[in-house]
Amino acid sequence: MKEYQVYLERARSRQQDFLYPLLFREYIYGLAYSHNLNRSIFLENVGYDNKYSLLIVKRLITRMYQQNHLIISANDSTKNPFWGYNKNLDSQIISEGFAIVVEIPFLRQLSSSLEEAEILQSYQNWRSIHSIFPFLEDKLTYLNYVSDIRIPYPIHLEILVQILRYWVKDAPFFHLLRLFLYNFSNWNSFLTTKKSISTFSKRNPRLFLFLHNFYVCEYEYIFVFLRTKSSHLRLKSFSVFFERIFFDAKREHLVKVFSKDFSYTLTFFKDPNIHYVRYQGKCILASKNVPFLMNKWKHYFIHLWQCFFDVWPQPRMININPLSEHSFQLLGYFLNVRLNRSVVRSQMLQNTFLIEIGIKKLDIIVPILPLIRSLAKAKFXBILGEPISKPVWADSSDFDIIDRFLRICRNLSHYYNGSSKKKSLYRIKYILRLSCIKTLACKHKSTVRAFLKRSGSEELLQEFFTEEXXILSLIFPXBSSTLQRNRIWYLDILFSNDLVHDE
């Protein structure tokens, strides 16, 4: 317990954060404008009422200065002088300012933590998304069970504000934040439906992402804290997580919750083979141990969300499956562990033995159905995978149309070149190729057969299948047919194609 007390005192020794005055500085909103130059609400493309200018910011800051009280009732929100004649624009500008200001203390802590852990020096070597898969090939083959847990969502914003106060010490800032959220929508029902989440995320994308990521980071912090403090295996990579105050009270409460079910409260945390991954609203747990220990981890997450975030996960939807029989989705792939059995004949003197050997191999599969749904959503095909034309691109030149399709095909080919079976990838290429031909035929107001016969574009469109093999043959001096069957991970992919994600 002495170690926890020292940890708590060090967290309490942080200085006061003075974020409130920054909300009244014009350059903060200028930073928000520069950060969101390509998609910001500040751009003059929505109409006169939504045009951004420093004059609008100055008037908004003046109204914020003149506000006498910060906590008001919902009935008076429509009469409050805090908002101008354009409430939506004011709320968007203020939310951008809130997002910029509230990120400042976290960026400061993150930079200091990364410098202490010396992660920045080696970060350049691990930027690629594909660098994850060689790691999984080494680790997942030794694991036996996996569990997909949907992160409970949405959550009431009052809980997020209370948790945020543990990290940032600035009472006026949080009063103004509550005022902004109260004026924007009904506080009691805010973020309790998917419709309200969609509306808020579209109007205030930066603030929404911060609040959502903060919620996820908070429960992961508690998870990692208990994982490292109660285990003899202290992992240095976990040092990037921040310190927080009032954690002993939460830890004691968690101990009381588990004391009813477990005789040794924290012994189940000592699982050196547990692996945790968060991806697209899910947290994936994989372990080598028996399902009983995985079940304890599942109940830990359920109690954590219920006790500290007042959200109710669905325990019946959390299944623990053998990794050899269950596939889970990660970074646009379907992953599972396949057991390859081989029989070896061994002979000693006059005796002959047949030995059966099982070798685990990570199977990385291209998710063909989600990709077809993504192609249908992007209007390259229908829901059954039948290619259709793209009339929106018909105004471009033939070269630009072919180049667009080739770039999409090339990106998908690079991203999925590490898959175990490439037949699904060839089908996606085929859909894009026919969609390109139909788009060109639609532009020239002709049929596909007549267009190919007249223009001779069939040879040009062969690049969909020949370009990748030609590039690989230049890089690797080996047989091209062998290269096409092998997995190739590219270490220069920093983000995935939009078609990869179907959610």
From Swiss-Prot:
Please name one Pfam family that this protein belongs to. MatK_N
What is one GO biological process annotated to this record?
tRNA processing
Q: What is the lineage of its organism?
A: Eukaryota, Viridiplantae, Streptophyta, Embryophyta, Tracheophyta
Q: Which GO terms describe its molecular function?
A: RNA binding
What species is given as this protein's source? Lathyrus vestitus
Which residue spans traverse the membrane? none
Checking InterPro entries in the record gives: Domain_X, Maturase_MatK, Maturase_MatK_N
Q: Superkingdom, according to UniProt?
A: Eukaryota
Instruction: Give the UniProt subcellular location, in the record's own words.
Output: Plastid, Chloroplast
Primary localisation category: plastid
Spell out the protein name for this chain.
Maturase K
